[in-house]
Amino acid sequence: MDFIFHYQSSWLIPMLPFLSAFVAGFGLISFRLPTRSLRHLYGLISTITVFFSMIISMNLLWKYIIGHSNYCFLFPWIVNDNISLKLGFFIDPLSSLMLFLVTSVAVLVMSYSHGYMSHDQSYVRFFAYLSLFTASMLGLVLSPNLFQIYIFWELVGMCSYLLIGFWFTRPNAASACQKAFITNRIGDFCLLLGILGLYWFTNSFDFITVTKRTEEIISNNNSHLYFFIFCSFLLFCGPIAKSAQFPLHIWLPDAMEGPTPISALIHAATMVAAGIFLVARLFPLFQLFPSIMNLITCIGILTAFLGSTIALSQIDLKKSLAYSTISQLGYMMVAMGIGSYKAGLFHLVTHAYSKALLFLGSGSVIHNLEPLLGYNPENNQNLVFMGGLGKSMPITRFTFLIGTLSLCGVPPFACFWSKDEIIADAWKYNFNLGLIAWITAGLTGFYMFRVYLLAFEGDFRGIIFLNKNNLKSTKEVHESNLYMLIPLIILSFLSLFIGFISTPFHDYLYIFLDSPIVYDNETSYFQILLNFSSIGVALIGMIIAYSIYAYNNISIDFGFFKRSLKKIYFEFYQFSFSKWYIEVFYHSLFLSGTRNLAQLLFYLDQWLFDGVVNLTGISTLLGGQSLKYKESGRVSSYLFSILIGALVLFFFLPLHNSQIGSN
């Protein structure tokens, strides 16, 4: 038992869910019918293995809380005169915190999935993918170098592709998983180039060694500065894609085509968290280059504002939460870019539990609307057809409200402490940056409370859908089963209390992380006023949402802005609903542009290249056809041709010789 809770047993944390995935996958391939008959057993095994991983992670976290030092274990994999590749695991405060975060969310998601996916024919395949996804993220967190982190980085991307396209018979799901995979290919390729570029100069993949040697090389030879800046930019492109930052954010909303438990895991603790984790892991390297830190800040604040403005007008429940995730990830990037390392990780933790709660709550709503509105996501996820669900789903409503208040930044819920700290640090760093972050907080309050009101308050509007399609249903919406409710209740407590690990009164997280940034703890009255103003602007956004959607939302057809507000507001609504026309631009540039280029190349190939080849053959054919008539067999014709040739030579040669003589 002592070995299990020792540092050297850390490899068990990713290995247990990996073995669970292997057993389920092997069973599906080799013993399909027996495996399907034991489907619930496989689901239970998957949950138990991740639960044991969580217990080991909790033990490691506790060891660091009481003051243990870092631990690294490496063994050589490929060693020769030219290259040395090592694998292993690295335990420090950052990895121990992330291990507990990933495993705790994964256990709750798997427990929830027993109820949500119970009737799905591919139940075992779902848990196999889910276990592999969790194992890949845990392996990424434990990676001691860039080489190993890239291996698990790719595995995380592959698992997201499999899970987003889990219902691959749906055209939208098949398209969404391809979109996610291709978009992330851009970031992954840049990340690979950045890793290879740094290895070329530093001859190492180790995080600490790469940072130290980079600093030494730059201090000794400043001519290599721009090369290292470029490599750092390439490294950052990986998190841009993985964490859905502008301009590679377009895949995340479409990823909602996957099962809702997967959406919760992707948005809370795996896929998008991987990008933030990599920035945190490479934070000392990025700090060497102020231009890279400024780029991280600019990308982050633009993404935060973009995500919040698009979320204002979305009518799909899960996509509204997806754009919320994009916005909150932007906040985390802002924190990293301005040097607020601890605040960024703090918001990663608080947002993970709050967003997992919101997605699992939305899954509870969708799961109970499917028998009534059908299994088409355009109907059962449409906020237009919801409303009044709080009457029949009180526990789901209450837990969803807790997640909403947390994400809005209402004290004392978890996200209040983390988001407020990021906004405060943004004000300190730059006034304009703080202003945009502050406005984004107000928008967050509006769109999150709007989602809650449209889903749970007022009267049930699903009758509109039923009447429109001449359908009658005797089924009623009811509360979810205990498999789904217990994770919601646990996440509600976490969303309420997890924020107290880092407060202005005592910052336990700062002490635990041993943050590389020294903070100015002096707080002015102006700073306190700014902190309270962020709460105020969030409340203003919530009040505006309440005034619009709380009372007469049964008659809302989302033409409100067009009918009752000025044209400029309607145009802003259209701008938001059209997602800033970014996807329209991408479609015109890449999809239509590629098709037009292919069409142009087709015509060039057909008429120019093939034309030259075909012209050679045709000209030879015509020449042969014309010459065959001259081969008549008559001697007089041949003599006439010889005479003509002789006359030409007789007159041409003297003329040519005279020109040569004059020269």
Swiss-Prot record:
This is NAD(P)H-quinone oxidoreductase subunit 5, chloroplastic. The chain crosses the membrane at residues 11-31, 41-61, 89-109, 126-146, 149-169, 189-209, 224-244, 260-280, 292-312, 329-349, 398-418, 436-456, 482-502, 528-548, 607-627, 635-655. Keywords: Chloroplast, Membrane, NAD, NADP, Plastid, Plastoquinone, Quinone, Thylakoid, Translocase, Transmembrane, Transmembrane helix, Transport. Its main location: plastid. One of its GO terms (biological process) is ATP synthesis coupled electron transport. NDH is composed of at least 16 different subunits, 5 of which are encoded in the nucleus. Belongs to the complex I subunit 5 family. It is a multi-pass membrane protein. GO terms for molecular function: NADH dehydrogenase (ubiquinone) activity; quinone binding. Disulfide bonds: none annotated. It comes from Chara vulgaris (Common stonewort).
